[in-house]
Every structure is written in structure tokens, then in C-alpha cells.
Swiss-Prot record:
Family: Belongs to the isocitrate and isopropylmalate dehydrogenases family. LeuB type 1 subfamily.
Role noted for this protein: Catalyzes the oxidation of 3-carboxy-2-hydroxy-4-methylpentanoate (3-isopropylmalate) to 3-carboxy-4-methyl-2-oxopentanoate. The product decarboxylates to 4-methyl-2 oxopentanoate.
Species whose genome carries this gene: Thermotoga maritima (strain ATCC 43589 / DSM 3109 / JCM 10099 / NBRC 100826 / MSB8)
Cofactor note: Binds 1 Mg(2+) or Mn(2+) ion per subunit.
Source organism, top-level taxon: Bacteria
Segment forming the signal sequence: none
Alphabetized SMART domains for the sequence: Iso_dh
Name of this chain's protein: 3-isopropylmalate dehydrogenase
Amino acid sequence: MKIAVLPGDGIGPEVVREALKVLEVVEKKTGKTFEKVFGHIGGDAIDRFGEPLPEETKKICLEADAIFLGSVGGPKWDDLPPEKRPEIGGLLALRKMLNLYANIRPIKVYRSLVHVSPLKEKVIGSGVDLVTVRELSYGVYYGQPRGLDEEKGFDTMIYDRKTVERIARTAFEIAKNRRKKVTSVDKANVLYSSMLWRKVVNEVAREYPDVELTHIYVDNAAMQLILKPSQFDVILTTNMFGDILSDESAALPGSLGLLPSASFGDKNLYEPAGGSAPDIAGKNIANPIAQILSLAMMLEHSFGMVEEARKIERAVELVIEEGYRTRDIAEDPEKAVSTSQMGDLICKKLEEIW
């Protein structure tokens, strides 16, 4: 079992370090061994090799069973040409190379952290438990033609039948094992690509008679996520709409530092939902929980270790219930635990409940 480990930029190396400590506990308890091969991506790779996705990193990823990523990007590299920046030349290029087509982002509001949410408790209700399924390989981020000159900038949004069918089936398969409800988000009242999207999603829905399908325009979806987030189970949407809505929904728990994500394709990529947070990098105050939960997703979806994944998730929940907080979710930042302390607490709890 081989994992390509790409710590990346900003807080990436710090939170990846804590997640790998959790993986060590799993290895000790199960007797299984993971081969961890480290690579460079993004700004880290630019500084070392002059390019955001070196050939050696590509090789490491293609030879691995799963890719475990920290974070990519930062203002240090913003003045580079777009194709040389960490996000476009690094992360987007990696996604394309691996044929990643679906980003899966679970959003859960822990009961003990309801007060941390920016929304009122009456809006959060008994809790929020939804998954955003975002198409990742097509749409306006990849469409051609695209360009920029002194007078205009232009992009192209394209979707084809095969691409929509694939992402729709992913969403329905996930919903089948949850509350059996898919909400497809588009802009079919004005965009031709969304008209095709809605048509194909309706066709795929017929293959899943036990799953309820509803359609909603993206502007209304953005509003409903604030007014009544508990109504959603699985949200299915396009690349750009998903980029925006998944970050909006990620605000519900009170911190991006709590939220994992996975990208499915030829090889699966696992990374936290938040960014590289260069302003707090190296200070040992970042929240490692998203990275640790991304590890749990990797164990479940790439290595079939479902029970072990549930134990990691439970350990995280118990540590939070016991009142431990990093600065991003602490009511009193002066009483917050550090990145490494949170990692140690989760490792200790995992040992206890195993």
C-alpha cells in the first residue's frame, strides 16, 4: 500500500505531520504498513525546482495507490504567469493528470460546536450533515478557448453527456447510502451547459428510483444553504458552482480546519478543504483535524479500511466533545491547544477507543 505524500505550502507540512502520526497508530493497531513516498508540489516545488509540478512528483503520484496532499499556494507566487502558479500549474495540473473528476466534501456540524457556527443555533437545528459532489474535470476552469489581453478576458464553459453522467452516478451512489436525496444545482434558465446538465441528470436519476432528485438554481442554492442547510443531503453540481458552494457550506461548522475532502479519479487525491493559510504557517496553531479526517477518507475509499476510518472520525469527535480546541474554533484563543497538541490528543484517543 503506497501513499504519495505531498505536504505542499503554508500550513500543509504541519498538518500533514499530525495526520501521519495518526496513520502510525493505525499501522501499529492493524499490523499493516503503508509505504509513504514524499514529493513536492506548488510553491514548494517552484522554490526548489522552478516548476509547480516536477516530473519526479508526477512519477511518485502515478506509482502510488493514493495521493495525500497538504495545501498549495500563497501570495509569494501570485506574480508568476498563471500557468506557472502553484494553483494552476500545480494543483489543477495534477487533477488533470490523474483524471480526477469528482470532489467529495462532507460537511458536518458537531453538536458540541454548534455555537461556533456563524449561523444561529435555530438555523443549524439538530445539526447539519451534507456532502457536496462537485464535478472537477470540466467546466469553465478547463474549457477552451480561453485567454486574456489588454481589452478582454474570456473563458468557456463546456459540459458533455459522458462527463455529466459520470458525476451524477457518483452523487446518486453516495446518496443511496445516506438519506437518499440528491439536489442538483445548475443555472439552466440561462446557460446552455446547464440545460444539458439538467437533462442528463434527470436521465441518470431514473436508474435510482429510491433516491429523490430535486433541481435548484445556483443563486437560490446559495441562499438556501444559509436559510436552511439541514434540508440538503447530497448536493450535485458543476466545477465552478461547486467551488463556490462547497466553500460556502464549509463555513457552516465555523472553520475550514474541520473539513476534509477527496477527489476521485484514476487515483484518488485526499486533501483538507481549506487553503495554505500562509499567515499562520510555522506557528503551530493551525487546525489539523481536516487533514486527519482526509486521512480517514483515504483509508476508507482507497484502502477499504472502513472500520479504521470510523474510529479516526470517532476519536476526533470525542476530543472535540472533551473541550479541546485549536485557535480557529476556540472561544478563548488563549486556552487553545497547538497543532501538535491536537494531533497528540487525537492519537491518544484513538489508542484508547481501539
